[in-house]
Design a protein with these regions (language model features):
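A short, active-site helix/loop in glycosyltransferases that binds the activated sugar's phosphate group
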Residues: 135-180
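Short N-terminal targeting/anchoring amphipathic segment
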Residues: 71-82, 88-111, 124-129
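Extreme N-terminal starter segment of soluble prokaryotic enzymes
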Residues: 1-4
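A short acidic, amphipathic alpha-helical/loop segment
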Residues: 19-23, 111-118, 140-147, 169-172
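Short, solvent-exposed loop/turn segments at secondary-structure junctions
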Residues: 9-11, 41-44, 106-110, 131-136, ...
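Active-site proximal beta-strand in glycosyltransferases
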Residues: 100-107, 115-136, 154-158, 175
Length: 180
């Protein structure tokens, strides 16, 4: 299978970089062909040794060094670009014959954005991975999960030891045990 990983978080090192490396290595180990989908001019810190597909919609938006007055503007810009990247990803899935798409670091905002774009109707399975659900975010997550439930190829995978996000009427919300 050709599996695309849509990465839009820029970090010099740490969690996101390591998680992408783990995903890519495991996909290769299982015989899949991983591909990275990233925003235009994405500044890679690591060579993952896979094909790179650049998404239209603008560069990554980061809060690094931004004043508290600039952050609300950047937040709006980030949301607009996320939707643009998802629209582009829906097109690239067809163009590059992608079988599944993984969004490795999601929040309820990612679900909301995904559901506003053609990506929700993708023939490829779309997996949004959540690294836990923060205190106070459960209600927003469940609300968006109910909306996503209408789309049979959208999966919400939560890395957690808890199972309070699971609901019988949300079959594509799934728990993934963390590697502890």
């Amino acid at each position: 299978m050709r599996v695309a990983i849509l990465e839009s978080i820029v970090m010099p090192a740490g969690h996101e970089v390591e998680f992408d490396r783990i995903l890519i290595n495991e996909l290769k180990r299982q015989g899949h062909e991983p591909v990275l989908f990233v925003p235009e001019n994405f500044p890679f810190k690591v060579d993952y040794g896979v094909d790179i597909v650049y998404l239209e919609g603008g560069e990554v938006v980061t809060y690094a060094g931004a004043s508290k007055w600039k952050k609300p503007f950047l937040s709006i810009l980030r949301e607009r670009r996320r939707r643009s990247w998802f629209i582009s990803a829906a097109e690239k899935i067809k163009e590059y014959n992608i079988d599944a798409l993984i969004i490795p670091t999601g929040t309820y905002r990612y679900i909301k954005a995904l559901l506003d774009t053609p990506l929700k109707d993708s023939k490829a399975a779309v997996h949004v991975i959540f690294h836990g659900i923060g205190k106070g975010e459960m209600d927003r997550f469940i609300k968006q999960a109910h909306r996503a439930n209408a789309y049979k190829n959208v999966y919400l995978d939560v890395i957690s030891l808890r199972d309070d996000m699971l609901r019988p009427n949300l079959p594509r919300v799934r728990k993934i045990l963390p590697p502890v």
